[in-house]
C-alpha cells in the first residue's frame, strides 16, 4: 500500500470521516476486499458504496489499477474529499460520484446505467438493505464483498436464496456470488 494513500486516509480521519482505529489497521482490513476478490479481468467495473472516508475504495484503487472504480457517497463534503484524494493519488481509473445508491440501483434496473461486475461496501447501512442494493447494482455472475463483524452469522440463507446469491466468508469480509 502506498504511503500517499495512508496519508490520505489520515486526512480523512482528521476530517471525521473515519473512526479512531489506527489507519494502518483499517487499510489492512480494506486490502482484504481485494484479496477476497482474487484476480479480476482488465476493465472490470467496481463500485464502492458509501465511500466517504475512503475505505475500502482508496485502498482498492491502489490494489486494482486495471479496474474501473466508482466511489459513491451522497454527502458532498465526503465526495469533495475523495475527489481531492483521487486526484492527488493519480488514480485516473477512479470516478467519484455524489449520488444516492438507491437511485443508482433504479437506474441500473431501468437500463439507464450499466450494472457492475463488483460491488463493495463497508459500514454502509443495515446488512439486508446493503445487500439488497448491492445486488440490484450487480449483473448476473458478478460479485459483492461486504465487511463482516468478527463473529456470528448475520445472513439469513432464505434471504440470500431470494436474491440469487451464494456466499462465503473470506477473512474479515463476506463474498457473495450472484448466480448467472
Task: Kindly give the residue locations of the regions a language model identified.
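Class I SAM-dependent transferase core
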Residues: 1-47, 77-94
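Active-site phosphate/pyrophosphate- and oxyanion-stabilizing loops and adjacent acidic/basic residues
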Residues: 31, 58, 132
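Alpha-helix C-terminal capping segments
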Residues: 36, 59-65
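Class I SAM-dependent methyltransferase "Motif I" SAM/SAH-binding loop
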Residues: 50-54
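S-adenosylmethionine
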Residues: 55, 64-70, 74-180
